[in-house]
A protein has these predicted regions:
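Short, well-ordered alpha-helices that flank and scaffold nucleotide-derived cofactor binding pockets
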Residues: 45, 79, 83, 100-101, ...
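Short, well-ordered amphipathic alpha-helical segments that serve as non-catalytic structural scaffolds
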Residues: 35-50, 95
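DPxDG-like acidic metal-binding loop motif
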Residues: 58-94
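Phosphate/pyrophosphate-binding loops at sites that engage ATP/ADP/AMP, CoA/4′-phosphopantetheine
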Residues: 43-58, 144-145
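Short amphipathic
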Residues: 25-28
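Residues at secondary-structure transition points
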Residues: 30-38, 68, 72, 165
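Oxyanion-binding and handling regions
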Residues: 1-22, 36, 90-208
Length: 208
């Protein structure tokens, strides 16, 4: 599959191009305040890896949870491009894409340090989602009952395995789950937004 993959849920902005299902090029930038300025340019650079834009079959894009503003920017750009090219869109949960890069068949958590002392967390067993994502205090991560794979741009004292969002793992996850995730260019696609209503303390029953 030929596709463009965009990950913008954190301060890391990552765009990659895939040709026939294989990675061709990747561009990574770190500056969440500049996503609105940088994203259009690096997406265009990735698209220019194809001599003819008609060869691009789909756009894979992260839909959060994460930086809601950055996710909306990327999704808006992708919707516009897909509408013009009549391409499919593959919306992908950021935490599920990150989990794809984790080689852990047991029960574990994947987390993103989202803002201030809060983080988004989701529970998995191998590649299987065990529970919806929720918000909690990052200092409570140490109270979780299983391994935690975390992305954070802050110094974390907890015993976590550090990982990073990537347009590469997002694309690979999108390709494998294409038939389940794919949307038409004119379908309704919305970011995953978690509010304080989803805030859960780690030692609450909801987080188990």
């Amino acid at each position: 599959m030929n596709l463009i993959s965009i990950e913008s849920s954190t301060d890391l902005c990552s765009v990659s191009s895939f040709k026939k299902g294989n990675l061709y090029n990747v561009i990574d930038l770190v500056d969440s305040k500049e996503h609105s300025k940088n994203l259009p340019h690096i997406i265009l650079r990735a698209m220019n890896d194809f001599e003819d834009y008609s060869k691009i079959e789909a756009f894979a894009v992260s839909i959060g949870p994460g930086s809601f503003t950055s996710v909306r920017i990327a999704l808006s750009i992708v919707k516009g491009l897909a509408f013009g090219l009549k391409n499919n869109i593959i919306p992908v949960s950021t935490l599920e894409a990150m989990n794809y890069s984790v080689n852990d068949k047991g029960i574990h958590y994947v987390s993103i340090n989202s803002f201030k002392n809060k983080c988004f967390i989701q529970k998995f067993k191998g590649s299987v989602v065990l529970a919806p994502p929720f918000i909690s205090n990052i200092e409570d991560i140490g109270n979780l009952d299983n391994r935690v794979y975390l992305y954070s741009n802050n110094s974390i004292e907890q015993n976590c395995h550090l990982i990073s969002p990537s347009s590469i793992s997002l694309a690979e996850y999108a390709i494998i789950n294409y038939s389940r995730l794919v949307k038409k260019y004119n379908d309704d696609i919305n970011p995953i937004y978690l509010s304080e209503n989803e805030f859960v303390k780690i030692n609450d029953n909801k987080s188990k």
